Design a protein with these regions (language model features):
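C-terminal functional regions that serve as terminal interaction/effector modules
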Residues: 2-48, 253-256, 260, 271, ...
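Contiguous mid-protein beta-loop-alpha structural module that forms a pocket-lining wall or clamp
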Residues: 145-199
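A short, N-terminal "cap"/entry segment at the start of jelly-roll beta-barrel domains
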Residues: 2-89, 180, 186-261, 265, ...
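A short hydrophobic beta-strand segment most commonly corresponding to one strand
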Residues: 115-117, 142, 156-176, 286, ...
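Short histidine-centered beta-strand/loop micro-motifs
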Residues: 83-88, 104-110, 152-153, 258, ...
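Conserved metal-binding segment of the jelly-roll/cupin
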Residues: 128, 134-156, 161-166, 297, ...
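A short beta-strand-loop-beta hairpin characteristic of the jelly-roll/cupin
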Residues: 100, 104-137, 144-147, 152, ...
Length: 367
């Protein structure tokens, strides 16, 4: 009797598959998992490898409508097999962009939110809906979803920055739209760096903006010199046990994330600092602004130095160590705003071994 029933169930399963139906009694555990289930792997790229290939692209590729952006993106190896091109995590895309003197990256807009974090060089600007903001190393620049934006270079040296977009998130929601502007440059509107003049402190609001909507953020550029000073002030207090001295970039009108969908964080690790391990649902991609050290992710040691990038997958144990003689600054983007909005975010402390993982392996980057 049991064998007959099993054979009947197997036939039923085959019949269901033929008409694109499925037996939930067999697949429930795949759909509703006890903990987050994903295929994102941690990975690290050395800066010299990225920069070498990016400069080579600079010699071979000229900007224009045929190639609007000269970017090398960070591909999560485990997601490529599913055709998820350009995915660094399930939700986030990170690329590294090069702009040469005299070039213009043509104006366009898209559904994806985007941030720029400046890595090296000066003399270039990003224009958002016509407001030009000149970029310096360590600055965070916002280009909110569906805003016209272009980049231009009036300086004399290559400028390189990090791009962060919510490509995976928007694709999963089937919400992607893209539109090129009719000209290479969107018409200039207002004074250069205007939003910085108005909102540089983040704690004061011009009376003329009392009725301004909260999104997008009225501040386009978050200057490194301001962020660094805040971190210096914060260093007079006790550090966070998991992130050291860390700040989130916020919208000065709402007090929430600077971008509605992409979280941005800068953290400072003082010499010898070893944070405790924890894990959370949101994923992140890190860039090492300066310093040297390592991060342990699920027991694997990822050694980093100035310029490197590394991926933190969702729900992964992690802790940071500064092995250098000076401060280390780690910039990161994350999908925390969306996880909080959807009430999916959770955080858990690692309670074994005094809050520190044992190292079981050391990651070897591909050079």
């Amino acid at each position: 009797m049991a064998d007959t029933k099993m054979k009947a169930l197997e036939r039923l399963k085959e019949d269901l598959e033929k008409v694109y139906l499925g037996p939930l009694w067999e697949k429930l555990g795949k759909m509703v998992t006890p903990e987050p289930d994903h295929e994102v792997v941690p990975y690290l790229w050395k800066w010299e490898t990225i920069r070498k290939h990016l400069l080579e692209a600079g010699e071979l590729l000229r900007l224009g409508r045929e190639s609007e952006r000269r970017v090398v993106y960070l591909q999560n190896p485990s997601l490529l097999k599913h055709g998820l091109i350009g995915y660094s995590t399930n939700t986030l895309y990170v690329g590294v962009q090069l702009l040469l003197p005299g070039e213009v990256a043509p104006a366009h807009r898209h559904s994806q939110s985007a941030i720029r974090f400046i890595i090296e060089g000066e003399g270039a600007y990003t224009a958002v809906d016509g407001e030009r903001t000149y970029m310096e190393r360590g600055d965070l620049i916002l280009t909110p979803a569906w805003t016209w934006h272009d980049h231009g270079h009036e300086g004399t040296e290559p400028v390189i920055w990090m791009d962060g977009l919510d490509v995976g998130l928007v694709r999963n929601f089937a919400g992607s739209f893209f539109e090129p502007y009719s000209e290479d440059v969107f018409p200039v509107a207002g004074p250069h760096n205007g939003s910085t003049f108005k909102y540089s402190t983040g704690a004061l609001r011009p009376v003329t903006d009392r009725k301004r909507k909260g999104y997008p953020s009225p501040l386009i550029a978050y200057k490194w010199k301001t962020t660094k000073q805040v971190l210096e002030n914060l260093s007079k207090l006790d550090p966070d046990p998991y992130d050291g001295y860390a700040v989130d970039y916020i919208n000065p009108l709402t007090g929430r994330s600077a971008d509605l969908r992409i979280g941005t964080t800068m953290q400072k690790l003082t010499p010898g600092m070893h944070t405790k391990a924890h894990r959370h649902v949101h994923s992140a991609v890190y860039h090492v602004l300066d310093g040297e050290g390592y991060t342990i992710i699920n027991g694997v040691k990822f050694e980093w130095s100035k310029g490197d990038f590394f991926i933190l997958p969702p729900w992964s144990w992690h802790e940071h160590v500064n092995t250098g003689e000076g401060d280390a600054h780690l910039f990161s983007i994350n999908d925390l705003p969306i996880m909080e909005l959807l009430d999916l975010e959770r955080e858990e402390a690692y309670n074994k071994n005094g809050g520190h993982q044992s190292i079981i392996d050391v990651f070897q980057p591909t050079l």
